[in-house]
């Protein structure tokens, strides 16, 4: 089989691989591609948004999922007319639905802009200020921690060891008096 040539799906002519890993001149051929998992890279700015499930991480499950029954309830024995109850339900639901849409139409884009700027600033400060300060602090504190450790081992360890030996000889007996 060595010395044979074949054409792959892309129309390239090359010799039959003489190794299990594939042809060294084209290492990512089909036999190797099955062995090596390839990661597909996606740009975060071009991802598609889901117009049906707009809360995929369930951020607002407990907070703003308010229905008519969560706000208005009539206890047993105190009921209004059925027509009033149905009209109240419809009024509440439709008002909440359309007023939310109106507010999101008026304020959604400006607030998205403000929150985008805020989180961009927050990310920038975290990446370029907070993390470097913490890393710098940890590097500087290592020197102090070594000196502190030497002082503890030099002065405190013998003192506490001596106190431990003194108190290790104390014996207590408990007697129950009747």
Curated annotation (Swiss-Prot):
It comes from Ornithorhynchus anatinus (Duckbill platypus). A lipid is attached at residues 133, 143, 156 (S-palmitoyl cysteine). The modification Phosphotyrosine is found at residues 6, 14, 25. Phosphorylated at Tyr-14 by ABL1 in response to oxidative stress. Ubiquitinated. Undergo monoubiquitination and multi- and/or polyubiquitination. Monoubiquitination of N-terminal lysines promotes integration in a ternary complex with UBXN6 and VCP which promotes oligomeric CAV1 targeting to lysosomes for degradation. Ubiquitinated by ZNRF1; leading to degradation and modulation of the TLR4-mediated immune response. The lineage of its organism: Eukaryota, Metazoa, Chordata, Craniata, Vertebrata. Residues 131-142, 167-178 are annotated as: Interacts with SPRY1, SPRY2, SPRY3 and SPRY4. The modification Phosphoserine is found at residue 2. There is a cross-link at residues 5, 26, 30, 39, 47, 57 (Glycyl lysine isopeptide (Lys-Gly) (interchain with G-Cter in ubiquitin)). The modification N-acetylserine is found at residue 2. One of its GO terms (molecular function) is protein kinase binding. Residues 2-94 are annotated as: Required for homooligomerization. Homooligomer. Interacts with GLIPR2. Interacts with NOSTRIN. Interacts with SNAP25 and STX1A. Interacts (via the N-terminus) with DPP4; the interaction is direct. Interacts with CTNNB1, CDH1 and JUP. Interacts with PACSIN2; this interaction induces membrane tubulation. Interacts with SLC7A9. Interacts with BMX and BTK. Interacts with TGFBR1. Interacts with CAVIN3 (via leucine-zipper domain) in a cholesterol-sensitive manner. Interacts with CAVIN1. Interacts with EHD2 in a cholesterol-dependent manner. Residues 2-104, 126-178 are cytoplasmic. Belongs to the caveolin family. The modification N6-acetyllysine is found at residue 5. May act as a scaffolding protein within caveolar membranes. Forms a stable heterooligomeric complex with CAV2 that targets to lipid rafts and drives caveolae formation. Mediates the recruitment of CAVIN proteins (CAVIN1/2/3/4) to the caveolae. Interacts directly with G-protein alpha subunits and can functionally regulate their activity. Involved in the costimulatory signal essential for T-cell receptor (TCR)-mediated T-cell activation. Its binding to DPP4 induces T-cell proliferation and NF-kappa-B activation in a T-cell receptor/CD3-dependent manner. PANTHER family: CAVEOLIN, CAVEOLIN-1. GO terms for biological process: caveola assembly; cell differentiation; negative regulation of endothelial cell proliferation; receptor internalization; regulation of cytosolic calcium ion concentration; T cell costimulation. It is a peripheral membrane protein. Residues 105-125 dip into the membrane without crossing it. This is Caveolin-1. It comes from the Eukaryota. Residues 82-94 are annotated as: Interaction with CAVIN3. Pfam families: Caveolin. Keywords: Acetylation, Cell membrane, Golgi apparatus, Isopeptide bond, Lipoprotein, Membrane, Palmitate, Phosphoprotein, Ubl conjugation.
